[in-house]
Amino acid sequence: MGNRGRLIAPGGLRDELAAVAEDEPAAGESLAEMAAQYGLRPSSARPRLVSYLVKVWQRRHFIFAYATARNVSMYTEARLGQLWQVLTPLLNSAVYYLIFGVLFKANRGISNYTAFLVTGVFIFAFTERSIVVGSTVMRANITLIRALHFPRACLPLAYVLVEFQQLLLSMVVLFAIVLGTGEPLTWYWLLLLPTLLLQATFNMGAALFMARVGAGAQDISQLIPFLLRVWRYFCGVMYSIAALPAELPVWAKNVLSFNPAAVYISLTRFAVMSSYRADAPGAKPYNAARCAIFTVKKTPSMQAYCHPDITASELWLAGVGWAVVILVAGVLYFWQAETRYGRG
């Protein structure tokens, strides 16, 4: 008989069909326009930057817990456990000492080469490892990324926190070596705290930047160790940039001195090594004759009578500048690809 004469209760099928018909896009209106009209957004859409940063901050406890758990589990299968966090840079320092200090005489112009070298190795290793793990973190955690919804920036930040926790453990050994080689404990050591915080900030930005690069180009992880090895040789880890041959232009020395890793290494040495501060160019009134002795013979104490190419204040400004610029650039670069992680 059809539907003629049949009563349909209010709110029944006919009303629902009418409501659907009313909500259908009008002629010429796209689904995107209709979604915008009702305030609908894709569930996987990239959030606004401020909202994204707020979400990252809200998950700070997850970042800390994840980093701590990973730090504890890293060496569970090794018999010496977390001692490898300290043994690795110490072994590297021993090798560099034999090659550069004994064979190549890179200790010329440096009063306390042991403390100078170990400080450089430990500080550079913090940045080096942060960049390496940053380049692989997204692919290494692809299952976690696909299973859970959270700001992806939490992962690179957690891995940098792992490296920072390892650095703090290494600092105990570094302090013992520095004090054991005759450096006194002074108030300058307090400058180590802002130095490490600036370096950690720089490392977070670098890790975020490399996380996006590594997520899109897996082969980059094979190239990164080589590039970092080259970078290490240009940072004054094993030698004094100020003691390089006089034939090297001043601008070239400034480029070496102002690269970020060299800046944080120099600031750390300035904080914990009294001999480094005493021998720094400009530490004493300028004396052309004594400066010439340093230029020829590389006598450490004579370096203090030379004009400084870079002052401590300039190093601090460079340290702050690198930290802020790289963090902002890393956050923006990583955030722009937030919805792409986990698709590969």
Residue ranges and their predicted role:
Residues 2-344:
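Hydrophobic transmembrane alpha-helices and immediately adjacent juxtamembrane helices
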